[in-house]
Amino acid sequence: MDVVHLEIDDPRWPDAVRRLRHDFYHLPEYVSLDGEWNRAQPMAFLARSGDAELFIPYLLRRCESLGPAEVGDAEVYDVVSPYGYPGLLLSDAARRSPRFAREAMHRLSETLRAMGACSAFFRMHPLLSDGFAELFSPGFFTAAGETVAMDLTLDEGALWKGVREGHQWTIKKCRKLGFVSRMVPLREHVECVMEIYRDTMDRVQAKESYYFGREYFARLAGMPGHVHCALVESEGRPAAACIFFECGGIVQAHLGGTRSEFLSKSPFHLLLYSVAEWARARGNRYLHLGGGVGGASDRLLQFKRGFSPLLFPFSTLRLVTDERKYRELTTRRAQAADVPVEAVSCGGFFPAYRAPL
């Protein structure tokens, strides 16, 4: 088995992605953008043995924000998925070989440890990881809720029938009130989308990590082949907006929201259904709406379930690649917060040393 950790400009990265069924989150240009935003090094792991391949992108982060970035004489890192649903990719041959899949993941852990990483946290892709759990021992993945997708292979009538009655009423009401939904170039509407998104994050009191700067939106706007923008207007005034990714038959809702003054009219209902119609007309298979905040079964998930009964299990992968360093950082976190180590290590957050306390 050949294994390698790829840097962002390595031509083997796009070559590997082209050979595997993938999504926008696996492309080097997206991982690079997310790495810059998070001040982390964008990388990917590739394992190959004949036709069997395993690929996963990741961000390599220094642990300096947790205190001194060294444990002993060595600098300490950890690994996390880019924002969204990157997850493992497996070739067809790899999906038929539990032995290959397990050995590849063992080599991933070994090589990350050699690079100084003490842990890794990966978010799986709900639509691309079917059957993965059977390849590994029980408990290898951690269940993290469900996500919602609209099946765009349905005919127009069946697609509409899958929408909850209350959502149907809201969509028809928006149209009757004169709201118009259209796809627009993100490059020409960056300021508008940013304003609506920030208004939405302020309203829901989102964590700081959900706020993205202008450069982030502008960089997305420079990827028009995969990145699209939907806008709902009322008499020419922007009411709701959302950025979508399109790749390999999957359309992903990324960042969006509703302007507060239009909230009572719920124009985002119209936006999502209109995008489903647009994506279906372009021959895509799924519009993936995602799940609740942090995978929770919350109001956001219930809202999304109103557009489709189709649910996919969402899971994460948690690896401790260096037990000693992991324990040391966890102890430091507990000491800094003046709480018992057990309050950090048993709290369910991973990695424990980054738990919000």
Language-model features: locations:
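Non-catalytic accessory segments adjacent to catalytic cores
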Residues: 99-144
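Aromatic (often tryptophan-rich) hydrophobic motifs at membrane interfaces
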Residues: 46, 216-329
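Short, high-confidence coil segments that cap the C-terminus of an alpha-helix
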Residues: 40-42, 114-117, 284
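A short, internal acetyl-CoA/4′-phosphopantetheine-binding micro-motif in the GNAT/acyltransferase core
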Residues: 86-96, 153-154, 256-265, 293
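Active-site/acyl-donor-binding loops of N-acyltransferases
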Residues: 62-64, 127, 136-157, 284-357
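Conserved acyl-donor/pantetheine-binding loop and adjacent beta-alpha core of acyl/acetyltransferases
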Residues: 61-87
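Short catalytic-loop micro-motif centered on adjacent basic/acidic residues
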Residues: 121, 182, 286-290
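A conserved beta-strand-loop-helix scaffold within acyl/acetyltransferase catalytic domains
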Residues: 2-69, 125-264
